[in-house]
C-alpha cells in the first residue's frame, strides 16, 4: 500500500474522475468508494445548495472517503462586447443570455463550496483550472482535508506542491474533458502520460496520480511502473450503469475510436477533449476566437441543454479520452474496478 | 525473449529510431546493433548512392542486424503557383529553388533504395509516411527481409498488418520528428501511447513497438506492460556521443522541457514535433497554409542548411519528443541502453 492509498485506506489505487455537468452524482461516487477506490463529486457546475444536497446524499450511501472537486475561478474579465455579440449570433439560443456571472460571484460560489467541505468534514478536496488561493488551502489543511491539485506539466505540478497540495493529479494529453493547464507554455502543454509521469515523479516529493486514456489493468500497472501512485479514470466510469451521463453520451463513447476525439474550446472557451461532432466541425475555423471561460460556456449552455433534451449528439459536449476504442459495453462500477485491478498490484 | 526480439536475436527490446537528415549514420546505428538492440539507418533524405555508401560502412562496423528506413512517397501533385510564390517570398533563401522533385523521381528514388536493401540482404526495412506499395512488399518478403510499418492509430496499424508488415511501430503523440499518420481521421490522429498501445495490441496479431517520449527503463517496462514487444527511442539516442545530430540540436534538447515542443508543418509541410523556435513562432498563423510534403520541405532546405552552418537554432528543425526534461547530459549508446534496460525485462 503506497502513500496515496494509505491516506484514504484504499484497496485499489484508483480515483474516479470528478466529471462535472451532471455525470458524477452520489450514486456513482459512492459505488466507487464502497469498492475501495476514491469516488468523487464534481461541484463545478453545481450551486452550493445542490452541492450540499449531494453531500448529504452521499453520506447516506457510503462511510468510505470521497473527494469533492472544485473549479478555481480564472477571474478573467468580460471580453469586448463585439466579440460577445458575434458569438451570440453564431450560437443557437445564446441570445437568451442577458448577463454573465461576475468574477466576484464566481469567488463567492468557490468559498461557499469550501465552507461546505469544511462543514461536512469531507476527506479530500481537489482543484481544477488553477492554483487554489492560499487562504482556502490554509483553512482546509488546518481542518485535515487532503488537498489534490491538477497539473498538465511538471512546472505546474511543482507549483501545486509548493502551494501545499498533498497529491497532484497529472493530466496527460490522453485525458477527456477540460484541461487543467494554467500556465502559459512555449509549446504544447498537453503531454502524453508516458513522458509526463516519470518526469513529474522525479521532480515532486508528493504522490502523483496519472489521468488520461487508461481503461484496464494494463494502464494501471503501466502508470504505477512509470512512477504514479494511482490512476484517475474518467471515460470508463462515465459509461458505467451507476453514472448519470446522458445515454447519448454513453452511446457515442461505446461507438467511438481513439482518433475520434480532439481538443476544442468551442463549447466552454477552455480546451477540452471530446468526440468530434457537428458543432465542432462546423465551427472549426473559430477555435482560436472563442471567448474565455466561463463566457463561452455560458453562451453555449442553452444549446447544450436543448440538445440533451432532444437526444441530439450534434450539439452536446461529448467529453471523452483517447482510450475509448476498448469501451464497448456498459458495465457496473464493480466490474470496471475488477478490470482495472485484476490482480494484486505490488506497490 | 518475445517474437520481436527473436526475429533479430536481440538482447534488448529496443529500436533506435531512424532519424533522417544526417542524425543517424552508421556510427550510431552500429553502436546500437553491437549492444544487442536494433540500429537503424534513415534513407529518407539520402540519395541512393549515399545510402549504398552507408550500407557498406555499417557492414564494416557490425555483424549484427540493423534496419533501413524508407520514406514512402506521398505522390502529391505540385501545389498552385500562387501558393508556392507566397512561400518563396516568406522563406529565407527559398527563391534559390528552381524546380521540385517530381512524383516520378520520388518513386524512382524509392525503388532504387529497395533494390539496395535487396542487394545487400539488409535484415529489416521500415516504412514511414504511408503504406508501402504491394510490389515492393512482395519482393522484400520473398527475399526474407523483415518489414516494419509505422502507424499512429489502430486503423492505420491494421492496414499495415494487412499489407504484410511483420512488425508495426505505434507512433504515440509524444514522439518527436515527423508523424507517420497517413489516413484522414475524425479527430486527432496523435494518440498518447498509454491509450494507443493496448488498443492496438488487442487489435493486431503481429508484434507492436511503442515510439514516443520514453527515456529510461520505466518507459520501456510500461510499454511492455501495455502490450508492446519493444520500444523505439529517438531523442535519447539523438543526444548520444555516437549521434551525428547538430551540436546545437543536442544542446537545445539538453536544455528543453516537456512543454517546449509542438507539432508543426512549417518546416516540411508534414506534421512533426520539435522544440518551438523563432521560425515556428513567427509563422504560427500560417500553420494551416503550408505546402504539402515535400514541397514545403524543399523550400525550407536552404534556410535550414544555412542555419546549421551558422549554429543558428532559430531556423533549424529541432525535432524532439516529450520526454526531454530528463535528458540532461550527452552519454554513450552503451550507457543509454543500460539505462533503458537496467534490469532483466520479463517478456
From Swiss-Prot, chains A, B:
GO MF assignments: nitronate monooxygenase activity; nucleotide binding
Annotated positions binding FMN: 69, 171, 176, 213, 232-235
Enzyme Commission number(s): 1.13.12.-
InterPro entries: Aldolase_TIM, NMO
CDD domains given in the database record: NPD_like
Pfam families (alphabetical): NMO
BP terms from Gene Ontology: response to toxic substance
This protein's UniProt keywords: Detoxification, Flavoprotein, FMN, Monooxygenase, Nucleotide-binding, Oxidoreductase
Entry-linked Gene3D superfamilies: Aldolase class I (3.20.20.70)
Cofactor note: Binds 1 FMN per subunit.
Cofactor section: FMN
Family recorded in the similarity comment: Belongs to the nitronate monooxygenase family. NMO class I subfamily.
Further remark: P3N is a potent irreversible inhibitor of the key enzyme succinate dehydrogenase in the Krebs cycle and electron transport chain. P3N has been shown to be a toxic metabolite to bacteria, plants, fungi, mammals or any organism that uses succinate dehydrogenase.
Job of this protein: Nitronate monooxygenase that uses molecular oxygen to catalyze the oxidative denitrification of alkyl nitronates. Acts on propionate 3-nitronate (P3N), the presumed physiological substrate. Probably functions in the detoxification of P3N, a metabolic poison produced by plants and fungi as a defense mechanism.
Name of the molecule in the record: Probable nitronate monooxygenase
Organism this protein belongs to: Bacillus subtilis (strain 168)
Designated gene of the protein: yrpB
Amino acid at each position: 500500500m503506497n502513500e496515496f492509498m494509505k491516506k484514504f485506506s484504499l484497496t485499489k489505487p484508483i480515483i474516479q474522475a470528478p466529471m462535472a455537468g451532471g455525470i458524477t452524482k452520489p450514486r456513482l461516487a459512492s459505488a466507487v468508494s464502497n469498492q475501495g477506490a476514491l469516488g468523487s463529486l464534481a461541484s463545478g457546475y453545481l450551486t452550493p445548495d445542490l452541492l450540499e444536497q449531494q453531500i448529504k446524499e452521499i453520506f447516506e450511501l457510503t462511510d468510505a472517503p470521497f473527494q469533492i472537486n472544485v473549479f478555481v475561478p480564472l477571474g478573467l474579465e468580460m471580453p469586448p462586447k463585439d466579440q460577445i455579440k458575434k458569438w451570440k449570433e453564431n450560437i443557437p439560443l445564446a441570445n437568451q443570455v442577458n448577463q454573465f456571472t461576475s468574477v466576484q460571484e464566481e469567488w463567492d460560489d468557490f468559498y461557499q463550496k469550501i465552507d461546505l467541505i469544511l462543514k461536512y468534514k469531507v476527506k479530500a478536496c481537489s482543484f481544477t483550472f488553477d492554483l487554489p488561493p492560499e487562504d482556502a488551502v490554509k483553512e482546509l489543511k488546518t481542518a485535515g482535508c487532503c488537498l489534490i491539485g491538477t497539473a498538465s506539466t511538471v512546472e505546474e505540478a511543482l507549483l501545486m506542491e509548493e502551494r501545499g497540495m498533498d497529491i497532484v493529479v497529472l493530466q496527460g494529453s490522453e485525458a477527456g474533458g477540460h484541461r487543467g493547464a494554467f500556465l502559459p507554455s512555449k509549446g504544447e502543454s498537453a503531454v502524453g502520460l508516458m513522458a509526463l509521469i516519470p518526469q513529474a515523479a522525479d521532480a515532486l516529493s508528493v504522490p502523483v496520480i496519472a489521468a488520461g486514456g487508461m481503461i484496464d489493468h494494463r494502464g494501471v500497472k503501466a502508470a504505477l511502473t512509470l512512477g504514479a501512485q494511482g490512476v484517475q479514470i474518467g471515460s470508463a466510469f462515465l459509461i458505467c450503469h451507476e453514472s448519470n451521463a446522458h445515454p447519448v453520451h454513453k452511446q457515442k463513447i461505446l461507438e467511438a475510436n481513439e482518433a475520434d476525439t480532439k481538443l476544442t474550446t468551442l463549447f466552454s472557451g477552455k480546451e477540452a477533449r471530446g468526440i468530434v461532432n457537428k458543432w465542432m466541425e462546423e465551427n472549426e475555423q473559430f477555435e482560436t476566437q472563442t471567448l474565455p471561460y466561463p463566457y463561452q460556456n455560458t453562451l453555449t449552455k442553452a444549446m447544450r441543454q436543448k440538445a440533451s433534451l432532444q437526444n441530439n449528439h450534434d450539439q452536446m459536449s461529448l467529453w471523452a479520452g483517447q482510450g475509448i476504442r476498448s469501451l464497448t459495453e456498459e458495465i457496473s462500477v464493480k466490474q470496471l474496478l475488477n478490470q482495472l485491478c485484476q490482480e494484486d498490484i505490488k506497490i
